[in-house]
A protein has these predicted regions:
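PRPP-associated nucleotide enzymes
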Residues: 1-221
């Protein structure tokens, strides 16, 4: 089989100026935002992205929907990426230190909040609460990737399905947990469409693992 690139490289890990398998990451992320906006009939005032990896998708959503893009969250540049912190306590503390809402951008408004992915759900819930505290009237969460529901055996730090909120809950249950007004994800097919000619490993979304799993298959049972 042809080699496949980890989808999370495009979604989360790589810089927007990166080019992987002839596909620019910024262009890919903008396309995911455009796809999310297609057919989305929610009534909203502004589009914001969770910095930094979601900003390109938020711009794409804004362009496709005609809704204005706003800087609704500001990032502390001296705090590392929360997803790759080793413990949940460190991830939670990282969110509190890392992001601040821009009250003037969201107060009294219906907000489309674009995020790149939901892994465990705790980070997204804290961000929704930050926006509520800043006065957002409604928060509609749009995820620029499919529901992440299966572990990765190739290097990404999601080794068990039990830690993944997408494995334990339905989309509606995740929405309730996040305390969001609505929630939508992409499909694996839409993600592959956004990637164009680049072959993606989407195993964590749909179980299409690139190799035989041997003893690791017990983790999925």
């Amino acid at each position: 089989d042809a080699p496949r690139v980890c989808a999370m490289e495009y979604i989360y890990f790589a810089r927007p100026d990166s080019v992987i398998e002839d596909v620019n990451v910024h262009k890919f992320r903008k396309e995911t935002g455009r796809i999310l906006a297609t057919g989305d009939d929610v009534q909203a005032d502004v589009v914001i992205g969770v910095p930094d990896s979601s900003l390109s998708a938020a711009i794409g959503y804004s362009e496709a929907s005609g809704l204005p893009f706003e800087t609704g969250l500001v990032k502390n540049r001296y705090v590392g990426r929360t997803f790759i912190q080793p413990t949940q306590e460190m991830r939670d503390r990282g969110v509190r230190m890392k992001l601040s809402p821009v009250k003037e951008a969201v107060e009294g408004k219906s907000v489309i909040m674009i995020d790149d992915s939901i892994v465990r759900g705790t980070t997204s819930r804290r961000i929704v609460r930050l926006l509520r505290e800043a006065g957002a009237r409604e928060i509609h969460v749009r995820i620029a990737s499919p529901v992440l529901k299966l572990p990765c055996f190739y290097g990404v730090d999601i080794s068990t399905k039990e830690e993944l909120i997408g494995h334990r809950m339905t989309v509606e249950e995740i929405r309730e947990y996040l305390e969001a007004d609505s929630l939508r994800f992409m499909t694996p097919e839409q993600l592959r469409f956004a990637a164009g000619t680049a072959g993606l490993c989407t195993a964590c979304f749909d179980g299409s693992y690139c190799t035989d799993l041997y003893s690791y298959s017990e983790v999925l049972s």
